[in-house]
Amino acid sequence: MSKREIKVGARFIGDGHPVFVVGEIGINHNGDVEIAKKIIAGAKHAGCDAVKFQKRTPEICTPKDQWNIERDTPWGRMTYIDYRHKVEFGEKEYSAIDKYCKEIGMIWFASCWDEEAV
């Protein structure tokens, strides 16, 4: 069997390398960079090698029949599409995440749910 490996940041992953642990943040930051930084710091403290966010375009990934359904959120009642927008990071927020992760030596990435999110 040939040796299979890839490089992520400064780390090699694959045959013969230590396990690569990813902390899933998803959208648990509630659209708040400071909360995201606290979660990243916790993942670093726990020994994670990387953290992963989720990125989606609400109009593409939220079924239209659910857009106007009101729900309880940490910010009170709002439509589902408004909630989906509130928890999404944009370029400005991801730039702050990138800067913070570089400062503490944490690899980060985001799984994109649609082409526009890429």
At which residue positions do the language-model features occur?
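Conserved, mostly hydrophobic/aromatic
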Residues: 24, 43
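N-terminal amphipathic alpha-helix/helix-capping segment at the start of soluble metabolic enzymes
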Residues: 1-22, 94
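Active-site beta-loop-alpha junctions enriched in small/polar residues
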Residues: 26-28, 56-58, 113-115
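Glycine-rich, proline-tolerant flexible connector loops at the mouths of alpha/beta enzymes
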Residues: 49-88
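A structural motif
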Residues: 47-48, 106
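Active-site beta->alpha loop and helix N-cap motifs at the rims of alpha/beta catalytic domains
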Residues: 74-118
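Hydrophobic faces of well-ordered beta-strands that scaffold small-molecule active sites
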Residues: 21-23, 51-53, 108-111
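Non-catalytic positions within long, well-ordered alpha-helices that form the structural scaffold/packing
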Residues: 44-45, 102
